[in-house]
């Protein structure tokens, strides 16, 4: 079944979707579209969770800041503990739960840990989609990206500018650039991503649930749903 602007009100089985893509590939935008198309779907973003931890200056947040400022991916153990705890707290481990994961897992070790956790609850991932976007496009997006930190709303000065320059459309509060939204840091992040993404893609291809779509389209194919 092909997702379009209409809502998908019925699926043959609970959808547990992993959205893959390099930093800046548009995973947040795709997530927003999917949540509108599938009302019963919920989402969790590792990036949003981390930013919340950093803002609260928790122990985990301070530890994560060190890695992010250097353009490095977080260690498997650190991010895995955070995400699996949140999945459990939200009650999303039961077989009937429907959700979308953005930004996790990023390594085969994280993927294996997630599979094992879901297996313990008689559940599993059943669709993995990668957003394919040229690196030049990503870097251009990042240079023009601003965010409203409290809500997570993202703006781009070229194709999604705020109504009032520098201010959030809803609250009127100031927009900021993320700590890692610089070309220098992002190039490092893209290299780190490439190193871990190929093994991760191979991991999910073996399970038969992997697919790729252009990150510049809104089309995601839902097979057998």
From Swiss-Prot:
Catalytic reaction(s) noted: a ribonucleoside 5'-triphosphate + AMP = a ribonucleoside 5'-diphosphate + ADP
Subcellular location: Mitochondrion matrix
Biophysicochemical property: temperature dependence: Optimum temperature is 30 degrees Celsius. Active at 30 degrees Celsius, and rapidly inactivated with an increase of 5 degrees Celsius.
Residue ranges of the region described as NMP: 45-74
GO cellular component: cytoplasm; mitochondrial inner membrane; mitochondrial matrix; mitochondrion
SUPFAM superfamilies per record: P-loop containing nucleoside triphosphate hydrolases
Main location: mitochondrion
EC number per UniProt: 2.7.4.10
Keyword field: GTP-binding, Kinase, Mitochondrion, Nucleotide-binding, Transferase
Coiled-coil features, chain-numbered ranges: none
Binding of GTP, residues: 24-29, 145, 154-155, 218
CDD domains tied to this protein: ADK (cd01428)
GO biological process per UniProt: ADP biosynthetic process; AMP metabolic process; GTP metabolic process; ITP metabolic process; nucleoside triphosphate biosynthetic process; nucleotide metabolic process
Subunit structure: Monomer.
Miscellaneous section: Present with 704 molecules/cell in log phase SD medium.
Family classification: Belongs to the adenylate kinase family. AK3 subfamily.
Name listed for the protein in its UniProt record: GTP:AMP phosphotransferase, mitochondrial
Source organism: Saccharomyces cerevisiae (strain ATCC 204508 / S288c) (Baker's yeast)
Gene (UniProt): ADK2
